[in-house]
């Protein structure tokens, strides 16, 4: 999908991803009863001279209309999508994790920048 400064691609998703997170580091946040981790894999390419990017502009929304923010502290998982700067044509790819209610359906990944329009991606069922 095209945003003013970026091309954003949803490369894949894994649900549940709780075992991935908990096996990576015993100190990662354990989801509350009735919740689970979802992992999305995203690629972001800069379309202008220079971009500052953060994965914290992504969130997940499902059938219950609840907005789930990304988990900030997930340790021990290789390939996390990290904040940083890119020059035109540069790409950052990686994983972002969310804790969502089990049974929540129709998950959508939302790119919600401070300035500009939101972009939505259907998260495939896995």
Regions found by a protein language model. Name each.
Residues 1-39, 43-126:
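Conserved functional micro-motifs across diverse proteins
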């Amino acid at each position: 999908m095209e945003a003013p400064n970026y091309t954003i691609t949803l490369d894949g998703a894994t649900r549940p991803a709780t075992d991935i997170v908990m096996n990576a580091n015993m100190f990662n946040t354990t989801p509350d009863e009735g919740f689970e981790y979802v992992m999305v894999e995203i690629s972001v390419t800069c379309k202008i001279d220079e971009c500052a990017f953060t994965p914290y502009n992504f969130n997940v929304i499902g059938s219950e209309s609840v907005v789930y923010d990304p988990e900030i502290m997930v340790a021990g998982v290789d390939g996390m999508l990290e904040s940083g700067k890119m020059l035109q044509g540069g790409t950052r790819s990686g994983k972002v994790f969310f804790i969502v209610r089990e049974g929540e359906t129709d998950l959508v990944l939302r790119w919600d920048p401070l300035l500009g329009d939101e972009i939505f991606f259907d998260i495939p069922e896995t």
